[in-house]
Amino acid sequence: MRRCLQLARCGFFGAPPNPMVGAVVVHDGQIIGEGYHIRCGGPHAEVNAINSVKDESLLKDSTVYVSLEPCSHYGKTPPCADLLVSKKVKRVVVGCIDPFAKVQGRGIEKLRSAGIEVTVGVLEEECLELNRRFVTFQSKRRPYVTLKWAQSANGYIAARESGRTHISTPMTQMNSHRLRAMNDVILVGRRTAECDNPSLTTRSWVGKNPLRIVLDRHASLPADLALFNGEAPTLAVTEREYPETRPGVEFFHPDYSMPLLEQLLSELHRRGIQTLLVEGGTKVLQSFIDSGLWDEAFVEHGSIAIDGGVPAPKMPKVSACEPKQFFGGNFIVARNK
């Protein structure tokens, strides 16, 4: 199963919005085939693993290990459970149940109904952790939310004066671009958009630009900001539309008499968006924290001190908090569990 997890990670950029899955075929204690889900819409891990077996006659006496329950429904590809049944494999070992509503145990039931021995829950926590973004999207019906900010040595996120405060180094800024490439959407508030004028693209990292979201209730942001340069699509969360056309901009008009974040996350879920990166500032970040609508946080601790300014967000007590280094910078990575 650990080999399944290794293989699954190879699909990090290609598999989403599908989960990352790895599969291994074992005969008489030897691996005779393996595969992973390479890209969304392509063959699943079990198919690639079965197809890699040179002597198909061995399958009837083989065990197939797979990190996620084989699918049981027709989507872009046929059900993997049907394939395993047709190949008459002897046994299937599953890492974890698929939380997707169209599966959720049905794949395992189909295998057992065909007389195949099935074992479930091997390295279950590791398998769920690997696909935590997919699991959150399916089980909580919202995107997996990652918070990211940099704070000074004395706990400030920005100086008192308007304008950008440079806490990150050019190297640690690459971590921001890495996180952007790993997420479907990036969000900032009106003040950050106006003061920092960020482009919110992945220009210093390989990967697609995320959808940019800006919270601008009164539609007051000027049209010459980098967010409206058309380099990447932008979703403006407002009460009304801007007076002029802005390239690549669409709108979401929530009911401001109701909680905003819940409405926004529900809308992103409806659009099939699985991951959201929140880059601030403090007011926006704190609103996610106070609402409990976050899953992971990357907090860079800079070496400089700021003489007063905007305090960094306050984190609650979390069950998982770990110091890490990225690109020579010191970070705290926290999980909301």
Give short role names for the model-derived ranges:
Residues 25, 30-126, 211:
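Zn2+-dependent cytidine deaminase-like catalytic core
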Residues 27, 139-140, 335-337:
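Active-site beta-strand termini and strand-to-loop segments that position acidic
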